């Protein structure tokens, strides 16, 4: 009844609906072009596709808002995105061969990043084999992080960083030089906004630091150019 009082609005909605019908007629049943196959790895997999960092109607929380944009960016990018769980890898150790890039996003010891799954030999072996064979691994926050056997980042040899928890205070940390010319930063203008960012992250010797703030690494790469 309320809409009847605004005929121009009703007419506009009718036109928009017709535009969507035309789009659907043109693209139904057609697979869109995708540049790469991307897997988002967490404890839920498909169970929480596209919503793995949203809590209670996506209410803002300081602890996880920095991760929202990653999933949102993937939704509009030309990638074939799948959400897989650690149990999926345990059930099929060759699962990662279907993908070009694996993304692990979240704070340490959460369902988003994986927690104790990263001490499982099958998981570690599958991810390292994937990277060794040319796959890309992107970690945001505290990926593959769980304190175990003297390491916090269980993929430190792939990620190129470690997080100081008071166990390595006397370890020499000389790698602080930034490489702003790196291809990952070529399309950026001005400062990169990391949201809350991360504290106490330091780079290993062979790592290319892209951005560090007050000797706290925020972005890096092990791809040398």
Positions of predicted regions on the chain:
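Short acidic/histidine-rich motifs immediately flanking catalytic phosphotransfer sites
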Residues: 95-102
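Short, hydrophobic/aromatic-rich segments at coil-to-beta transitions
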Residues: 204-211
